[in-house]
Amino acid sequence: MNKTNPTIALVAGEVSGDILGAGLIRQLKAHYPNARFIGIAGPRMLAEGCETLVDMEELSVMGLAEILKHLPRLLKIRKNIIQTMLQEKPDVYIGIDAPDFNLDVELKLKANGIKTIHYVSPSVWAWRQNRIHKIAKATHQVLAFLPFEKAFYDKFNVPCRFIGHTMADAIPLKPNRAEACQTLQIDPAQRYLAILVGSRGSEVEFLAEPFLKTALLLKEQFPDLQFLVPLVNEKRRIQFEAIKAKITPNLDLHLIDGNARQAMIAADATLLASGTAALEAMLCKSPMVVGYRMKPLTYFLAKRLVKTDYISLPNLLANEMLVPEMIQEECTPELLAEKLSVYLSDDESAVKNRHVLIQHFTDLHQKIQCNADKQAAQAVIDLLEGTENV
C-alpha cells in the first residue's frame, strides 16, 4: 500500500449507508488527503469525492418480492463489482451494511488477498446466528454500533470493534424541547404523545388501528393530551389517513411530514414500533412503549428464530426491561394505554419514575456516544497500516 494515497473501496446500498460512508470518507481524507475512493455511492458519498461504479439506487430494493424481481440485475451488479475490485485491487474494501450483497463480495475479495471490513453488524446476535461463520470468513473486521454486538463476536473470536452509534453523536445528551416545539410550530405548554406507526406498509397496516384506539382511550383519561404523528412519506400518510377515517374519524391529530426526532423530543411520551425508532426515542429521552404486531405465521416463525430476551434496542442495551414491549396479542389499546398512562400521569411517584428512566436513557446514550465516524476511520487506518491484528 502507498502510505499516502491508498485506494479505498466503499459500497453502500441505501440512504443510511450513504450517510455513514460520507462521514467515514470525510474522516479518512483528513488522514489520507490524496486517497482515492471508489465503489457504489449515494449523493453524500459522491459529494465527498467517491467515484461510483453503479448508481446506489440500483441496490435499494426492499422486500422479498422486490428482491426476487430484481435478482438477476443484483447478481450481475455483484459479479461486476467483484471483477472490478479484483482488477483495481483496492487497499481495503468496506461493505457498508447491505449484508446480503456485501458479504459475498467480501468473501471473494478476502480470499484473493484484499483486506475487508464490514461496517454495521447484521443482527446476527438476534437471529440466523449461523451467519457468524460466513462473516468470519468474509471480513478482517466488523465495525459494530453497539457494545453487546462486540460481546457476541468476541464469543466466536471474530475481530470486531465497537465504534459507538452515529445517532448518539447526532443527538445531544439534553435535547432542546423548546426548539423542537418551535420547529413543529406547536405550543410547548401542551402535553403531547408522539405516535410512530413505522416506516413499512405492513407496520402501518398492523399498528395504525391499535395505536389510534390507544390514543382514544388516553384522550378520555387526559382530555388535554394532544397527538403528534410523524409519517415517513406521502405513501404512508395516505395509508394512515385511510385507516384513521375508518377507526377514529373525529380524533384530532397533528400529522407531520417526517420530523420524527423533533416529535419525540417535544412529546411527553412515545408509542412506537420496535426498530431503530426505539433507539432514537431513547436518545431523545422520550419515555416509550413499544408495540408490535405481525401476521400470525410470521410471528410464529419469528418467536422460534429470534434468540434474544428483548426486541427493543433500549432493553437490549440495558439488558433489562427498561421500557414495556407489547408484542402481538399483548399489543392491545387497553394494555398500551395502561402502560403509557404511567408516563403521562402527574402523580408524584410517576414523575419520579419518569426522571429515573430518563437518567437510564442518558447513561446508555453516553455509553454509545463515541464519535463513530472518527472511530470507524481509525479502525480502517489501523487495518491499512498493520497496527490491527488480522
Swiss-Prot record:
InterPro entries recorded: Glyco_trans_19
Catalytic activity: a lipid X + a UDP-2-N,3-O-bis[(3R)-3-hydroxyacyl]-alpha-D-glucosamine = a lipid A disaccharide + UDP + H(+)
Keyword entries, A-Z: Glycosyltransferase, Lipid A biosynthesis, Lipid biosynthesis, Lipid metabolism, Transferase
Biological process according to GO: lipid A biosynthetic process
Family the UniProt entry places it in: Belongs to the LpxB family.
Role this protein plays: Condensation of UDP-2,3-diacylglucosamine and 2,3-diacylglucosamine-1-phosphate to form lipid A disaccharide, a precursor of lipid A, a phosphorylated glycolipid that anchors the lipopolysaccharide to the outer membrane of the cell.
Protein name per UniProt: Lipid-A-disaccharide synthase
Organism: Haemophilus influenzae (strain PittEE)
Lineage, opening ranks: Bacteria, Pseudomonadati, Pseudomonadota, Gammaproteobacteria, Pasteurellales
